A protein has these predicted regions:
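Flexible mid-to-C-terminal extensions adjoining Fe-S/redox cofactors in radical SAM and related proteins
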Residues: 1-30, 284-370
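Short amphipathic alpha-helical segments and helix-helix/interface helices
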Residues: 70, 94-98, 120-124, 155-158, ...
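Short, solvent-exposed loop/turn segments at secondary-structure boundaries
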Residues: 58-60, 142-146, 314
């Protein structure tokens, strides 16, 4: 399937305008959020997960390497997002949280919730904003996560906060990926969460790809950048997104409205009814987010467990063990990538990536409340 890309399109013009607005078009871009992927390891194997997690020990950065990277970046006061795998499985995550507390930078943690009680004191000390992945209530959650008692571990953490640190709930959000496995249990999850004063609940549409899209992206990557794309967005379980499922997703809007006065609930991406149909279509998902602008290559670097720095899924710029962050992030390879993105407006797989749908406030920071 050919992708219509016009370098002189309105999207390209819009890109130049937005990137200029955020003063990011120069060759020196300052990150607003830095994703620290501490480990690829995870104690769960979620049905909808597209990351190739493993329980096998792999070479990971020493905590001293992370400290050095944070020190190099901390003058810019970005938000440091601890990610994985399961970031709380990283052997020295406690020491890293202690160091981040000293640097007085905003901290976020995305976690499956299994180890939250173990690190709750350190998370509170650093005032971390925590996003917990939940898929439902009781066995629905456990079965999707393929991890017995995982729901009870999260419920235990919430009960702990209720007794000992209720004010910290304002830092706690829940993300629920919608799938055919849990779509009929979403309201039960909302009802459960309504017992706790959490900050927000995000109902996320699946991230998924296909062999055809991966091959198309790889061909584009080789032509544009002379390298293969390592992007893999294939969940552990292959789902069918038929009309009946899409109808059930759309019906959730009325459920969310019913709870709107009691909880802060949103969909991500925020799609209207026609775009829901497009998003789940292999042929029409390119029509989604036609006015969207992705600033990840300027604003949100990812540092992988082995030290690789990525600006976009499937693109490695360099490694912090071999070169300084700033030389990599604002080097020739990333600036060339940014120019290509501005010219094309988007790449074939962009509408399948969550970064494509992120919103930004006027400072260029991610608007996490949307």
């Amino acid at each position: 399937m050919a992708i219509p890309i016009n370098p002189l399109s309105d999207k390209s013009v819009a890109y130049r305008s937005v990137v200029d607005f955020y003063s990011a078009r120069s060759s020196f871009a300052i990150p607003r959020k830095v994703i620290l992927c501490l480990t690829d390891r995870c104690n769960m194997r979620c049905n909808m997960c597209t990351l190739q997690h493993t329980t096998v020990e792999k070479k990971e950065l020493e905590v001293s390497d992370w400290v050095e990277a944070i020190e190099e970046l901390s003058w810019a006061k970005p938000t440091f997002l601890l990610f994985g795998g399961e970031p709380l499985l990283y052997e020295n995550v406690g020491s890293l949280l202690d160091f981040l507390c000293q640097r007085d930078c905003p901290v976020e943690v995305v976690t499956n919730g299994f180890f939250l009680e173990k690190y709750v004191d350190k998370l509170i000390a650093v005032d971390a904003r925590v996003t917990v992945s939940m898929s439902g209530v009781d066995k629905v959650h456990d079965n999707i996560k393929n991890c017995p008692n995982s729901f009870q571990r999260i419920a235990g953490f919430f009960d702990f906060l209720s007794r000992h640190a209720p004010a910290y709930f304002s830092n706690v959000g829940v993300n629920c990926v919608m799938t055919p496995d849990n779509i009929d249990g979403i309201e039960e999850l909302i009802h459960f969460l309504s017992s706790y004063p959490i900050h927000s609940l995000s109902l996320q549409h699946m991230q998924f790809s296909s062999v055809a899209l991966r091959n198309m992206t790889d061909q584009f990557w080789k032509k544009a950048f002379g390298a293969s794309c390592t992007l893999v967005l294939e969940p552990n379980v292959s789902y069918e997104y038929d009309d009946a499922y899409l109808k059930r997703i759309k019906l959730l809007s009325s459920v969310v409205k019913k709870w709107s006065g009691k909880m802060n609930i949103s969909f991500f991406p925020a799609l209207d009814s026609p775009d829901i149909d497009n998003y789940y279509s292999d042929r029409r998902h390119f029509l989604c987010g036609k006015d969207n602008v992705c600033l990840k290559p300027w604003r949100v670097p990812t540092i992988c467990p082995n030290g690789d720095i990525s600006n976009c899924s499937g693109m490695v710029l360099g490694n912090i063990k071999k070169q300084s962050f700033w030389k990599i992030w604002n080097g020739e390879k990333n600036n060339s990538f940014r120019d290509s993105l501005i010219s094309h407006g988007s790449f074939p797989f962009c509408t399948r990536c969550c970064s494509f749908y992120e919103k930004y406030d006027l400072s260029g920071k991610l608007n996490v409340d949307e």
